[in-house]
Regions:
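Beta->alpha loop/short-helix hinge microenvironment recognizer with preference
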Residues: 1-391
Length: 391
């Protein structure tokens, strides 16, 4: 049994056999190639030479895949830093929209179409209810982020929304209720359920849905109607996970959800020639962590379920926080609230400068003597370079 293994290790061992058995789509193959070759030199290298002692440093480039566990830190930090300019010192709420597991097979068969529908319906629900004077009577702003996994990497599509707890009324004045979240969860759940099932019905009537695997039975109109009726009868889980106040709290909180992948390296405990052991949350036992053992190919299959469609945008901004509105309207809200503007610290910085700001490491200094590290001149260091690369 091997200890301290990573997702890259698991893919290197089990993905080749998984690919032979399953013939995955091209974007899954690309993701696997990126994960297996990240920081191995396959994506190029950066060479630096010390001007004083001649020490050579070689840094293997990362793959930059959004599904790679080794490539999320920089995008996360840059994204969070960019949001500082749009965050207000006002209440924020974390609302989660989920769908019944009965819809999982249809959603997985139509990922791009029905993921987009999740965003659209969650947005329509929040907009409709927040504009109702009975609840708030204002235009609000929020960020939606799709996650498709549960703790065990099972398929569990749901939308995380970070909702600004106030907005602009018809007179362009700031309005908030204070205290608890301004929308009743039961009302949100019913409206979201109705809108999403109406969307499914419309797509089925327009013959836009595909049915694969266990979803094939829903090509039959009677079976599809039975499914919708069953989902109408269920209570859809919509809840507010946390309430927090203050810009810095929001900024710190955002990082937990924006650039997550299905599983991180630290949750993988070990692997054998045939199995992988990782830890999952046992929600039936107060959320305690427990170890789970599955076959290596099953681990790959579960991971691949959560690779997003090509060019799919997972983080979307709406209302006051949309690209069209945030420059003018957030500035107006800030003036009304008397908030100070948070200034980005990473804007326009390159990777070397970001490393220095975030980790206080100067990669331009030699680790041996403290001299300046520079890119080598081919005529002066070509022999040393080739000798190093052969090692």
């Amino acid at each position: 049994m091997e200890k301290s293994c990573t997702i890259q290790d698991v893919f290197e061992r089990f993905y080749p056999s998984y690919e032979k058995r399953n013939n995955p789509p091209s974007h899954h193959r690309k993701t696997a190639y990126h994960i297996m070759n990240c920081k191995t030199g396959a994506f190029g290298v950066n060479i630096s030479v010390c001007e004083d002692c001649g020490c050579i440093s070689v840094h293997n480039n990362s793959c930059r895949s959004r599904c790679c566990p080794m490539c999320q830190e920089f995008p996360k930090e840059k994204w969070i830093d960019a949001q500082k300019e749009n965050v207000l010192d006002a209440p924020y709420y974390h609302v989660v929209f989920t769908v019944p597991e009965e819809l999982n097979s249809i959603i997985y068969s139509n990922q791009k179409l029905l993921y987009d529908a999740l965003y659209h319906v969650a947005s329509a629900t929040l907009n409709e209810l927040s504009k109702d004077a009975k609840y708030l009577g204002a235009d609000i702003g929020y960020i939606c982020i799709l996650h498709t996994w549960g703790s065990a990497m099972n398929y569990h599509p749901h939308i995380h929304t970070i909702v600004l707890g106030g907005g602009l009324d018809d007179e362009n004045k700031w309005k908030e209720t204070g205290g608890n979240f301004f929308l009743p969860y039961g009302v949100i759940s019913k409206v979201f359920r109705g809108k999403y099932l109406d969307e499914l019905k419309s797509l089925w009537n327009d013959s836009k849905l595909k049915f694969h695997g266990t979803a094939e039975k829903y090509q039959n109109s009677y079976r599809f109607k039975e499914l919708l009726d069953k989902c109408y009868e269920k209570n859809w889980v919509t809840y507010c996970k946390e309430t927090f106040n203050g810009a810095q709290s929001v900024i710190n909180y955002l990082g937990k959800y924006t650039h997550r992948i299905a599983i991180s390296n630290h949750r993988i405990k070990s692997m054998t020639d045939t199995t992988v052991t990782y830890v999952v949350k046992d929600y039936k036992n107060e959320g305690c962590w427990k170890e789970k053992i599955i076959s290596g190919e099953e681990f790959i299959r579960r991971f691949m379920m959560h690779v997003p469609p090509k060019r799919f945008v997972r983080i979307r901004h709406y209302g006051l926080l949309s690209c069209r509105n945030k420059r003018k309207k957030i500035t107006h809200c800030r003036n009304l609230l008397g908030c100070k503007k948070y200034i980005s610290t990473l804007k326009n910085l390159n990777a070397v400068e970001m490393i220095k700001v975030l980790y206080h490491i100067d990669v331009c200094k030699c680790s041996s003597c403290g001299g300046n590290m520079v890119s080598p001149r081919k005529d002066k260091y070509s022999s040393s370079f080739h000798a190093h690369m052969r090692c």
